[in-house]
Amino acid sequence: MAQKINPLGFRLGVTQNDRSHWFAQQRNYSKDLREDQKIRTCIENYVRTHIKSSSNYGGIARVEIRRKIDLIQVKIYIGFPNLLLIEGRGQGIEKLRNDVLNMLDSADRKLHIAIEKVAKPYRKPNILAEYIALQLEKRVPFRKTMKKAIELAEREEVEGIQIQIAGRLDGKEIARVEWDRGGRVPLQTIRARIDYCYYPVQTIYGVLGIKIWILEE
């Protein structure tokens, strides 16, 4: 029988890299791990609440965290950076930094946040998943949404993409799984540069789960 495994963890060290870079003693490891999750959640909530791009969604591709003795370095890869989030313009970065520090409840630690724009945002599954979630919240038909997302990814010259949506699609009483694919997506090959994300979205019919696999060149 098939064994389910996260595609990113399956390829870690081969075609995928860690998104947190730090070392901790055993007694502090779980604490730092929870802090990383809180930092990512705080950043995502801030972007969704305060930053409205032309597409009406944040467009965060990933968040990388590096830790030193008294310094936390956070690098946000974003597809559609608002002027308030670009370094040197406005107070967006400073307000975000203060929000994260208040959440960590640690006044003696330094935090540095950097923003990097993603050249081709629709090659990133997290950004595509946000786009699909926005369309589903607006009650756009899920098949139309999947086909449009595949078109956006193919314009960015991805080699292959697979999208799966599960839940009460179109408000039907029985939940089901629907998927669509463009190009090739060899999930069983470790050497294939597969990027993946899972994104839940709350609709009036319940929670839908979105999974996206993208084969990069």
Curated annotation (Swiss-Prot):
Protein localization: Plastid, Chloroplast
GO cellular component, one term: chloroplast
Stretches assigned to the KH type-2 domain: 47-119
Pfam families per record: Ribosomal_S3_C
Keyword presence, Mitochondrion: no
Biological process terms in GO annotation: translation
GO terms of molecular function: rRNA binding; structural constituent of ribosome
The keyword DNA damage appears for this protein: no
Origin: domain of life: Eukaryota
Key words, A-Z: Chloroplast, Plastid, Ribonucleoprotein, Ribosomal protein, RNA-binding, rRNA-binding
InterPro entries in UniProt: KH_dom-like_a/b, KH_dom_type_2, KH_sf_prok-type, Ribosomal_S3_C_sf, Ribosomal_uS3_bac-typ, Ribosomal_uS3_C, Ribosomal_uS3_CS
Main location: plastid
Family, as annotated: Belongs to the universal ribosomal protein uS3 family.
Quaternary state and interactors: Part of the 30S ribosomal subunit.
NCBIfam families noted in UniProt: rpsC_bact
Name of this protein: Small ribosomal subunit protein uS3c
Organism of derivation: Pinus koraiensis
Classification lineage: Eukaryota, Viridiplantae, Streptophyta, Embryophyta, Tracheophyta
The encoding gene: rps3
